[in-house]
Amino acid sequence: MNIIDILNVTKGSLINKINLNLTINKFKINSKEINKGDCYIALVGNTDGHKYIKEAIKNGASLIIVSKKLSYNIPTILVQNTNKAIGNIASLIRKTYNPKIIAITGSVGKTTTRELIYTILKTKYKCHQSKKNHNNHIGVPLTMFDLNKDDEMAIIEMGMNHFGEIKYLSKMITPDIAVITNIGTSHIGNLGSKENILKAKLEIKEGLKGPLFVNGDDKFLKSEYAIKSGFGNNNDLIAYNLTSSLTSSTFKIDLDKPYEIKVNLPSHLISDALIAINIGLYLKIDIKNIIYALNNYQSYNMRMNILKDKNNNTIINDCYNSSLESLTGVLNLLENKIDNKILILGDINELGIFSNQIHNEIPFLLDKINNKKVILIGKNMQKINYKNAIHFKDYKETIDYLKKQVIKNALILIKASRSLKLENITNYFLNLSSY
């Protein structure tokens, strides 16, 4: 990619016109990651990227993009806003490399769906996917920056907190296929209602060039014009005969004949698998390859990982994030389990004025489960007056309590929003000897 193209797309001005015939390899916002021939973009956020320009040049940067007028002996593009510039460059990369892009949004299940789609598509295509949860106005461009010329497919998450954010991302990368996993209560504090969350998620169609795939069993999505999957008869791809455990599920779908599919996911995540299957079929993946891929799928770290510790405890490590919908799903799995259960639950964040209302629904979910001890963590959970529940401020207090307990042969659920860092409790159980 040449400097003139970058200059045009960012609508910037050249400060230093040395060697404008250079070809840029990659775009980076971390000066430590710069290699020879890369472009360093000085973002201004929690830290000011302009402070690290000298390090970027030392590491081999061939071009820098800045929003402050600085003079270095290197080609430099001055723009009004480097945060907006990375979006413009992401659009340029999209047009230059032109992979088929699959964009995914939804209240819950974005990462699981992305991983499932990637697992299926890589059986036939060279694929690229979002790293971690790179799904906002910074993360999506970073995902595009990592694209290679020979990537045929890019599977990209899109998250949001407010109206307009997904519209911006969709127009930036103009997806060929879009996915909405479901409509729940995540970010309801900012948007005010599920109806508004639906409107915000549907912004993914603003830049969409092809079909929309949705969970047709979701009551907010079933009336949308889309390719649908689920268990209801209104769907284009219909699953049936579902059997499941904590670690896996088996179900059937009908194509030219019935096919049985096994995937290492519990029942409340099968809607994500069905969307992935539907997209795989749309993109001409043989059903036998889809079945093989799903049978070998392993869930993402801290998302419904089933672990064993030295005391024969089974740990459900689901502490990457939480919502009322995902918590309901995992607690439903435990209703018929006879094991002694320890439910370690932390706050659900980003609920705004709806926080008390949603947290107050949790006791009704807990009432359905027998043989349980309940540990509630965080300022919102402390407001829940649940019978015999133990409350702690944070994971550190919780671990101090657990050190005094003898816990063996139990089924332990650990779940909360990301900021509570409950993976530290998981690590405590797995590494008792080091505490």
Task: Briefly describe each language-model feature range.
Residues 45-46, 160-163, 184-186, 217-219, ...:
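Short glycine-rich anion-binding loops that position phosphate/pyrophosphate groups of nucleotides
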Residues 4-10, 85-212, 216, 220-225, ...:
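Phosphate-binding loop of NTP-binding sites
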Residues 66-74, 177-315, 336-339, 364-373, ...:
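Acidic, Mg2+-coordinating active-site environments of NTP-dependent enzymes
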